[in-house]
């Protein structure tokens, strides 16, 4: 007898729920915690050592009450009416500040809903929002021109709080509020619309409360958790739980200025200072922070952000590789990473998944989006609204208490449907997400979009909206807008444009400047002007060909005829080497898509830089020996300032012995390898190659730590006898911090390798053997083979570079002293490849690692990226 098929319907836990107005919950907290700190704010421009401003729960509540009374009076006094949905909306155009949070609370207390307008929004977007949502008032920062709001009444924050100063500070009674306190909608957030026009999502108090109650039950605040952080843009739905979750539980909120959020160095310092224990962020910011943490704090005894134990990723797809790299830095079982899925229409989150370990993540091709939140149900439906079977792909629909009330002016009613599958009243409505999903082993997997929407830095962007704005430019004949590598590090919105035949000369950057007046920053595409639009046989646009065009132009290893333009004319003579290092590094990171000359006056971000590749650029500069901080790099107005900082902080790497030590506190001395060094050398090599090796990472989990020690134990006595290897002592601590292992290439011992490391050694022989046997000097004492070099795990990046430089110089000294003809080595690490360039090694082979075919026909390094290379180098020691 057959069994019934399991259908893709997943129900969250059922929690008791009593609808309440959110500001009333805050008022209860104020009674319990009147004198506790509620708000902490330190402007990004505040001088060093100055105390941040703080407000207690009582102060915040009374100030909000007075402001609320003024808002009610202004509304009645100006005879202002609710909009067509019956909502009293107050738009807020303010930067993150202490006053911003109090103003939002005041709007609720007055009986209104707040609608955030980012100060950076272009005029046409603001105009559309005001025209459609019809807010009664706009509250703005003092320095924002009231004329931007085109006739809608405005109040500056100074006016709001000055005029309300004499009003009562007690809580408002329901009858004092707009609509007698029958406030239903709490927040209106504008998102990208499928028709190319932004639409406002109406979020009720009860939906927000259900989302918060699930959070409080699932991730309760601990006794030692005093401060939480508010750093997400107010226009982004994740700001709701980030801001109001802690304030309705008696915690303090640390308001982070935008400038700090964009600077990993300052953000990490702030999170450390206040011992923040949880953080909500988009995967892009997580990647930036992990890069920074590994660069700055990976070797510290107490890791940076160790106190931050709950990490929530939301707003973009979370890749398995990024989630795994989280556990490369943080501890499994101590630190937790969560993948949240949703949209503004479901309060940002309707499902979640807990990432627990690298082993767990290795079971997935993509990180699941998990299971539903409390009081919600997720359905995967086919085109006829019938649940699909487990494992099949269906469109994701959500129902329950997390749903929005709909859109402003009742737009797009087809997105909110009557639920034919509902039994209980709270599940009577369905929201159509426009995403595909499948149910596998109890978890929902994200399977892509049904339309042209993508997530950019956590913001939902409909490509049709971008395309509509591009097509409206007067010179454009045809526009096609696509997203390159959606959800990945190099994600980009691209506008492929064919100009009208009669169009005058115009550059891509000029067109982008025009679009910045029409679109938000995160929506502004990179323009690519085409001579003709490629078509498929059926006459449709060949979108893959367009993406390939962009990819080819951005591939640094691709068309060698594409040359980046560097202008050194304004660089002082003594800084030209430094400038060359910077320009080449920036060009390599940003790629050939930059259409501007790299010159001292160039701005990194205008060239195409962003927060993620700024960290990568600094990492590469540090590998070249330049000690420049992330904050210094980000704050620089142009490349000229960066050149000066690079030169001031650390001169370009020199080969002279007195300049080798990039860390003055390290006093290094090379000592020939001795028998008693065995364990320390093994520890260093194992740590260097097991944890950081560029080839072995693709063979895990098959490679063990003991595999390295077995090989070294086998050859140890020979290494010592040959007297070509050495260790490096830090004479301040009398500890070994590095080791270089060398052999005569014509007199190497045979080793019986039974582990998976045999693949690595066979690959190295594949690269080196033909060159060594056919092109290098014959006989003994001719080729010094530098085959292993490692540094102590405790060294920070600067110390690591200094030690590597010292060892490279010492290998040269050994080769000369022992009268070898030259040094032979294969470098698989970007750092040692850079050092080989510095020491003028000759490249004999540059091999793409993922193309190696093993003797059994497999490609053991097939998952390596195309840019990972193994470079065989040779240096004649007399040169």
Swiss-Prot record:
The modification O-(pantetheine 4'-phosphoryl)serine is found at residue 611. Beta-alanine binds at residues 825, 827. GO terms for molecular function: beta-alanyl amine synthase activity; long-chain fatty acid-CoA ligase activity. Optimum pH is 8.4. May also use Mn(2+). Gene3D superfamilies: 3.30.300.30, 3.40.630.30, ACP-like (1.10.1200.10), N-terminal domain of ligase-like (3.40.50.12780). It is found in: Cytoplasm. It holds the Pfam family AMP-binding. Its main location: cytoplasm. Disruption phenotype: Reduced histamine levels in the head; specifically, in the central brain, beneath the basement membrane and in proximity to the lamina neuropil. Fewer synaptic vesicles in the terminals of R1-R6 photoreceptors. Loss of carcinine production in the head. Photoreceptor response to light is abnormal. Electroretinogram (ERG) recordings lack 'on' and 'off' transients probably due to an impaired synaptic transmission to postsynaptic cells. Induces a darker pigmentation of the body. The pigment stripe near the posterior edge of each abdominal tergite is darker compared to wild type. Transmembrane segments: none annotated. Induction: In the brain, expressed with a circadian rhythm with high levels at the beginning of day and low levels at night (at protein level). GO terms for biological process: amino acid adenylylation by nonribosomal peptide synthase; chitin-based cuticle sclerotization; circadian rhythm; cuticle pigmentation; developmental pigmentation; dopamine metabolic process; histamine metabolic process; locomotor rhythm. Residues 573-650 form the Carrier domain. Signal peptide: none annotated. PROSITE patterns: AMP_BINDING, CARRIER. Dopamine binds at residue 696. Histamine binds at residue 696. Residues 666-679 are annotated as: Condensation. The nonribosomal peptide synthase is composed of three domains. The adenylation (A) domain is responsible for the adenylation and activation of beta-alanine using ATP. The thiolation (T) or peptidyl carrier protein domain (PCP) contains the prosthetic group 4'-phosphopantetheine, which activated beta-alanyl-AMP is transferred to via thiolation. The condensation (C) domain both performs the selection of the amine substrate, dopamine or histamine, and the condensation of these amines with beta-alanine via an amide bond. This is Beta-alanyl-bioamine nonribosomal peptide synthetase ebony. The gene is e.
